[in-house]
Amino acid sequence: MSFSELNIDAFRFINDLGKEYSMLNPVVYFLAEYMMYFLALGLVVYWLTRTTKNRLMVIYAVIAFVVAEILGKIMGSLHSNYQPFATLPNVNKLIEHEIDNSFPSDHTILFFSIGFLIFLFHKKTGWLWLVLAFAVGISRIWSGVHYPLDVAAGALLGVLSALFVFWTAPKLSFIHQMLSLYEKVEQRIVPSKNKSNDKSKNF
């Protein structure tokens, strides 16, 4: 059995769950289409805690996503495939999507780059974001818009980019300088009695 056949078989196994357990399709649809807004809201909440640790985490997370997305575009130019619903018969398709290159999965890149970066900062609670990232990845296959390989590649890019940024960004002093300047201006405009720059504080 070829790797391509394994990829298709794995897709069929997950996607066919939508036919067997159709009552879960609305939940899967929500995960696949709208959970990104929950992720964005989570980053806003972390930012509004006004701790330097959380704000650096948000900045690093955004950088990790940008790095992963750039790498994803490069990978997509080297290998491409259309969505399963465009190439396979009898696909459980939950999402209306234009036919284009589905490799790698942008949604998975987004959730794993940011989710894993959060995990690196907050290991006690960050695993929840990884569970969410995994759920979103599965939902994209279940919905018929990605193959397992698309999702796996996106997850790998996201994790590697998060690790790269987590290890290298602290050495970029201008990030800390810009954040410090922002916080000084913010403190003048919107004073916070409990403002703390304690990087060990968890949210």
Swiss-Prot record:
- Keyword Transmembrane helix part of the UniProt annotation: yes
InterPro entries registered for this protein in UniProt: P_Acid_Pase_2/haloperoxi_sf, P_Acid_Pase_2/haloperoxidase, UPP_Pase
Lipid bilayer topology = Multi-pass membrane protein
Q: Which Pfam families match?
A: PAP2
Q: Which GO terms describe its molecular function?
A: undecaprenyl-diphosphatase activity
What superkingdom does the record give?
Bacteria
Subcellular location, in the record's words? Cell membrane
| Biological process terms in GO annotation | response to antibiotic
Q: Which UniProt keywords apply?
A: Antibiotic resistance, Cell membrane, Membrane, Transmembrane, Transmembrane helix, Transport
Transmembrane region(s): 27-47, 56-76, 103-121, 126-143, 149-169
| GO CC list | plasma membrane
Q: What does this protein do?
A: Part of the binding-protein-dependent transport system for bacitracin that confer resistance to this antibiotic; probably responsible for the translocation of the substrate across the membrane.
Q: Which protein family is it in? A: Belongs to the BcrC/YbjG family.
> Which PANTHER family does this entry report, sorted A to Z?
AT30094P (PTHR14969:SF13), SPHINGOSINE-1-PHOSPHATE PHOSPHOHYDROLASE (PTHR14969)
Q: What is this protein called?
A: Bacitracin transport permease protein BcrC
Q: Which organism is it from?
A: Bacillus licheniformis
